[in-house]
């Protein structure tokens, strides 16, 4: 299993880092078999697998439950777990206790925090306490309730400078990596070159040190629409939906199960069953 020191070396050597989300045992198993470098148990699970319209309702118990399943499916892959909405915006002590709970109970190797500002101090204190932290700047889904959109961030000179300053701040605080989401590719390239820690892009161009995409987006599973930055490598819904419809049709028509799908017993053992022929 790769560790933070390996990710630093990959950046230094120009080797791209691959990260894929996973939310359960089978998806984690798939990701590990694909030899991805990292797994992100994102609070995006709230929208992707729990059916919420945002990440806000996701709880710590949700994140722990899903991370434990992921760990069983991918025991040899570095796992990063999101700290969900408002679990790191109270006191430093509360943040440390919440991170401790996630790491100890789920087995996650690192936690991910969105944003900067007061979050920078939380990253520093978690790092001091021995908890690896991945930072996240640009489009931060937990803040969409305030911003009101999933549009590209940091397109103006002022916003770009602010993001650069924040990136340098989270690095100085001790973050082991930085996710850059939905920002101009030119800015992502400059940030990646300015930092010594790896950058993981999603909708941030090819010049980041690595890339992350959602498992379901990659394979086309349960997706109603894809963002511009997503490439579809498969569309398994096209196979799943007809398969399920065929099952329903065959059960209704009594053509499933066939004899080959059934178990049998000797006829003589049936005779006199319960005293009846």
Swiss-Prot record:
It comes from the Bacteria. InterPro entries: Pantoate_hydroxy_MeTrfase (IPR003700), Pyrv/PenolPyrv_kinase-like_dom (IPR015813), Pyrv_kinase-like_dom_sf (IPR040442). Pathway: Cofactor biosynthesis; (R)-pantothenate biosynthesis; (R)-pantoate from 3-methyl-2-oxobutanoate: step 1/2. The keyword Metal-binding applies. GO terms for cellular component: cytoplasm. Its cofactor is Mg(2+). GO terms for molecular function: 3-methyl-2-oxobutanoate hydroxymethyltransferase activity; magnesium ion binding. Its main location: cytoplasm. It holds the Pfam family Pantoate_transf. Binds 1 Mg(2+) ion per subunit. Keywords: Cytoplasm, Magnesium, Metal-binding, Pantothenate biosynthesis, Transferase. Its EC number is 2.1.2.11. GO terms for biological process: pantothenate biosynthetic process. The active site is at 181 (proton acceptor). Homodecamer; pentamer of dimers. HAMAP family: PanB. Belongs to the PanB family. This is 3-methyl-2-oxobutanoate hydroxymethyltransferase. It comes from Listeria monocytogenes serotype 4b (strain CLIP80459).
């Amino acid at each position: 299993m790769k560790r933070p020191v390996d990710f630093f070396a990959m950046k230094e050597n120009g080797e791209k880092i691959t990260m894929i989300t996973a939310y359960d045992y089978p998806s984690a198993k798939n990701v590990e078999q694909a030899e991805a470098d990292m797994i992100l148990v994102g609070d995006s699970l709230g929208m992707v697998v729990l059916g919420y319209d945002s990440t806000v309702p996701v709880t710590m118990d949700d994140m722990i439950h899903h991370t434990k399943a992921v760990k069983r499916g991918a025991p040899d892959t570095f796992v990063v777990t999101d700290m969900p909405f408002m679990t790191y915006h109270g006191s430093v002590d509360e943040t440390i206790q919440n991170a401790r709970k996630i790491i100890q109970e789920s087995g996650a190797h690192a936690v991910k925090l969105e944003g900067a500002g007061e979050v920078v101090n939380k990253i520093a204190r978690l790092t001091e306490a021995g908890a690896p932290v991945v930072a996240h700047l640009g489009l931060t889904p937990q803040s969409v309730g305030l911003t009101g959109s999933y549009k590209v961030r940091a397109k103006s000179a002022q916003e770009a400078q602010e993001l650069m300053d924040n990136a340098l701040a989270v690095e100085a605080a001790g973050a082991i990596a930085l996710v850059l989401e939905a920002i101009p590719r030119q800015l992502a390239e400059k940030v990646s070159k300015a930092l010594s820690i790896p950058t993981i892009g999603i909708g941030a161009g090819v010049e980041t040190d690595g890339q992350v995409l959602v498992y379901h987006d990659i394979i086309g599973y349960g997706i109603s629409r894809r963002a511009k930055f997503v490439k579809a490598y498969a569309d398994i819904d096209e196979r799943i939906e007809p398969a399920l419809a065929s099952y329903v049709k065959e059960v209704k028509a009594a053509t499933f199960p066939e004899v080959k799908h059934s178990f049998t017993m000797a006829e003589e053992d049936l005779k006199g069953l319960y005293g009846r022929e």
